[in-house]
Amino acid sequence: MTIAIPFDNSYARLPGGFYTAQAPQPVRAPRLVAFNADLARLLGIAPGEVEEMAQVFAGNAVPQGAEPLAQLYSGHQFGNYNPQLGDGRAILLGEVLGSDGIRRDIQLKGAGRTPYSRGGDGRAWLGPVLREYVVSEAMAALGIPTTRALAAVETGETVRRESALPGAVLTRVAQSHLRVGTFQVFAARGEIAHLKRLTDYAIARHYPDAQGPMGLLAAVRDAQARLIARWMGVGFIHGVMNTDNSSIAGETIDYGPCAFMDTYHPDTVYSSIDRYGRYAYSNQPDIAVWNLAQLATALIQQAEDKEAVVEEATEIVHAMPELLERAWLEVFAAKIGIARPGEGDKALVSELLTRMAREQADFTNTFRALGAPRARDQFTDPTAYDSWAEDWRQRLTQEATPEAVIRAANPAFIPRNHRIEQMITAAVEGDYTLFERLNTVLARPYADQPDHIDLTRPPSASEIVPATFCGT
């Protein structure tokens, strides 16, 4: 085997109760459809022949040094606790230390049944695999912490969902797959030794300066506050912010029914399973606080003096809304050209958003257009913009380089939902042209790319995607 992956597997050295050793299940006729060469270089992976990479990234050939396993976790799903979830379709091959010194997991998603599959087939179909590949790489290019996509492979098999669909496997890369739910499962079971071991492991891996469980809680809080603010700044809606999808490392993980807003409205929901809007765009900061409270509840279980720790944990959690608001304001102030927000700037941003919602303005294009004299064109009634812009321009007289700040904070290109659906439809028919084009264009989201201006346009009435689906 010529492909070389320099594994160093710390999670596999934890006690067996953290995971189950599980080899991927081979597939019939793997075909490599995407390989992220830049990410491979960062990870120190020496690629092999295309045929060989197809075998490895489909799970047919386990590379030397891998210790494949499925991780155990539980979690709150739409507010209801599920005591055992775990990797039902994913296999962690192992970890590598990148050239940047960061340890990362390499995981095969859609690699077959595990002890945690709960009756599922352990497989994924092509659509969600390509969606996660495109969207996660777009998020990375936007500068938002995220899992990454190393490879996508067609399996040559069909999976049965609403109909027979082409199977696929995604190779996902993450700083870890530790979730809030990883802590919850041991706390709920009263396995305090495992909970302490997990806490020490998470601190050593992600936050070496954190002091004990409450230091870890504060570090996760800060990372999540920064992350959610960045989501809000690009109109990203995760769609399924369960605690098992909340990353301890502060990365976006488990894209499922994710979407980007076209027309701005704070209550926007795309996920077909989010029937009551729990994870709507505007609710995401509050849900992040709720998820942090569940992590706090789990971490507290290892304390000897629980009363004192409860008080400290409460203070840490209660500080998160203010941190979120501060991070949100920094993000949105930059979007209107303000490098260091001050008094009155929140009201200025909020008033623009109110008018955008009322006038059904496109979220991405409106903010991008603030750097050019065309933002008023995004409003059905341009005078709604004009009256706000008077106050805004007056505020910008205090800024040195507002145009540069606007361009750096506002992408021209995002993975618009209708383009993702068009890409999937074409790929199922064997045409990867749009998939490849999206990956190329979205790698430079802040650059003007005149040849691809069509990818900045909102959907027509017939192209609107009203709902998104997990679909894996």
Curated annotation (Swiss-Prot):
Cite the binding residues for ATP: 86, 88-89, 109, 121-122, 172, 179, 254
Q: Name one Pfam family in it.
A: SelO
Q: What is its EC number?
A: 2.7.7.-, 2.7.7.108
Report which reactions are catalysed by this protein.
L-seryl-[protein] + ATP = 3-O-(5'-adenylyl)-L-seryl-[protein] + diphosphate; L-threonyl-[protein] + ATP = 3-O-(5'-adenylyl)-L-threonyl-[protein] + diphosphate; L-tyrosyl-[protein] + ATP = O-(5'-adenylyl)-L-tyrosyl-[protein] + diphosphate; L-histidyl-[protein] + UTP = N(tele)-(5'-uridylyl)-L-histidyl-[protein] + diphosphate
State if Repeat is listed as a keyword: no
Keyword Nucleotide-binding in annotation: yes
A molecular function (GO) held by this record is: ATP binding
Question: What are the protein's UniProt keywords?
Answer: ATP-binding, Magnesium, Manganese, Metal-binding, Nucleotide-binding, Nucleotidyltransferase, Transferase
Task: Locate the transmembrane regions by residue number.
Answer: none
In this chain, Mg(2+) is annotated as bound at 245, 254
The cofactors it requires, by name, are:
Mg(2+); Mn(2+)
Tell me the domain of life: Bacteria
Active-site residue numbers: 244 (proton acceptor)
NCBIfam families reported in the protein's UniProt record? PRK00029.1 (NF000658)
UniProt function note: Nucleotidyltransferase involved in the post-translational modification of proteins. It can catalyze the addition of adenosine monophosphate (AMP) or uridine monophosphate (UMP) to a protein, resulting in modifications known as AMPylation and UMPylation.
The entry's family comment says: Belongs to the SELO family.
What protein name does the entry list?
A: Protein nucleotidyltransferase YdiU
